[in-house]
């Protein structure tokens, strides 16, 4: 397989995923030579497309509503590699943080983080509203941070 080059496409902010899906559909329908499409959630207004040349990317975005233009130049893989590394959902939480449970049987409840287990992607919390503190283990994606622990 030929070595792909990575190009940056400017898109409407907030429409990155939609635009990437439309480009993917067009590439599949018309058998365009695109190798990969990356729409990182942390990057607003841009998506990255791997293709053999710039003209393949320009053909893919032609007629796509929210795709504006292909930026000049290529992006080295090392610049976008960190977007591909999966971080556990519990990274960033510390004991003492106040969180809100956003899924499961305790949805909507506020809780205090007791322990974080990054290897299992789980957090042990104590519900703030309960009279007796009972530790509850929940998955990392079931919590949303409300406030960080106050440092002395």
Curated annotation (Swiss-Prot):
Please report any disulfide bonds recorded for this protein chain, giving both cysteine positions: none
The answer to whether the entry has keyword Transcription regulation is: yes
| GO (cellular component) term, any one | chromosome
- Source domain of life is Archaea
The reply on keyword Signal is no
Disruption-associated phenotype? Essential, it cannot be deleted.
Q: Which Pfam families match?
A: KOW, Spt5-NGN
Q: Where is the KOW domain?
A: 95-126
NCBIfam families registered for this protein in UniProt: KOW_elon_Spt5 (TIGR00405)
By sequence similarity, the record places it as follows: Belongs to the archaeal Spt5 family.
Main function: The Stp4-Spt5 complex stimulates transcription elongation on both naked DNA and histone-bound DNA (chromatin), facilitating transcription through the histone barrier. Neither protein functions alone. The complex also stimulates the transcription termination activity of FttA, neither protein alone nor the KOW domain of Spt5 stimulates FttA-dependent termination.
Cite the PANTHER family for this sequence: SUPPRESSOR OF TY 5, TRANSCRIPTION ELONGATION FACTOR SPT5
Subunit (UniProt): Heterodimer composed of Spt4 and Spt5. Interacts with RNA polymerase (RNAP). The complex interacts with FttA.
The protein in question is named: Transcription elongation factor Spt5
The scientific name of the source species is Thermococcus kodakarensis (strain ATCC BAA-918 / JCM 12380 / KOD1) (Pyrococcus kodakaraensis (strain KOD1))
Gene name? spt5
């Amino acid at each position: 397989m030929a070595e792909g080059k990575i190009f940056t496409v400017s898109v409407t902010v907030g429409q990155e995923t939609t635009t990437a899906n439309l480009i993917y559909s067009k590439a599949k329908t018309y058998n365009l030579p695109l190798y990969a499409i990356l729409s990182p959630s942390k990057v607003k207004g841009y998506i990255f497309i791997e293709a053999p040349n710039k003209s393949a990317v320009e053909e893919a975005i032609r007629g796509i509503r929210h795709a504006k233009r292909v930026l000049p130049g290529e992006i080295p893989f090392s610049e976008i590699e960190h977007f591909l590394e999966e971080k556990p959902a519990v990274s960033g939480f510390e004991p003492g943080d106040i969180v809100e449970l956003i899924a499961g049987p305790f949805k909507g409840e506020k809780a205090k983080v007791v322990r974080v287990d990054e290897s299992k992607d789980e957090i042990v919390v104590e519900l703030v509203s309960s009279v007796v503190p009972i530790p509850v283990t929940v998955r990392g994606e079931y919590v949303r941070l409300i406030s960080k622990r106050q440092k002395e």
